[in-house]
């Protein structure tokens, strides 16, 4: 099974966490699911640089104060995901969705109200435990 290495940003602002919703996808298990923004680590790229690049591409925003949180391993039906999560803050205040269909800022205790991608659930639980 193919393994994909990705990074995810837990962006916080005023006690709330940024959540983004994927668009419709042929793979039902990720279609319209909520997730933390991020994406694939490219060959030769370190994780922090990958996350900064992905947030620029997906949200047209800059992040800083990256702090490693945890790594999640999750097997979907046709690939294995290794996801490295970092907490961070926005350097710029504006977000423009480039790839997602919706976004919400939620307090940690309200995160479980959304329909999350399975790989993000351990992050969700960790954030809710910290609140």
Report each predicted region and the residues it spans.
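NUDIX/MutT-family hydrolases
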Residues: 87, 96-127
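Conserved Nudix-box catalytic region and its N-terminal flanking loop in Nudix hydrolases
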Residues: 16-57
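Active-site-adjacent beta-strand/loop module that shapes the phosphate/pyrophosphate-binding cleft
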Residues: 62, 72-94
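Hydrophobic packing within well-folded, soluble alpha/beta domains
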Residues: 51-55, 86, 103
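Conserved N-terminal beta-strand and adjoining loop/helix that marks the start
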Residues: 1-18, 40
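Short secondary-structure junctions
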Residues: 58-65
